[in-house]
């Protein structure tokens, strides 16, 4: 990200056509997009009967935009961050300290800093999700539902399960399914890799 920003600055002086740097982590057009689209879609598809929303943070745009919209509609909706082990955001939400603990094979989510997008999120609490909790979710969905989802989805769904248990029966919990499993073939479906990491392995691998 820093290299991209520096390159954009360098090109501004030499490119007559101008330069566009999306800067998805700190450009709050990201969270605004989710405030204007994803949040309303969730509200509409649940007929406004959503009790909790939980998801991870990469850029922070999704959880910031969705949480801002849902909290405007109903301040009692619970918003939780689902954070992979090794990320600093769980401790930031729960303890006010940017401190990562553990590690994860999950890619693309979690962070060691608070992005401009994430800073706008309206979050009630956070869950720290280890691989031993998220991977079985992924494997179960492949085997039982025919859904081939990636590691970010595993973290999100594991968080949704936790929030469901926390809020109790009869609640509507929403999360985001944001990646496919084929992006992680060398990890998710590699028995040797999983054995070396001491991670859960389904019988069918």
For each feature predicted by the language model, list its residue ranges.
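Surface-exposed amphipathic alpha-helices with a cationic face
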Residues: 67-74, 164
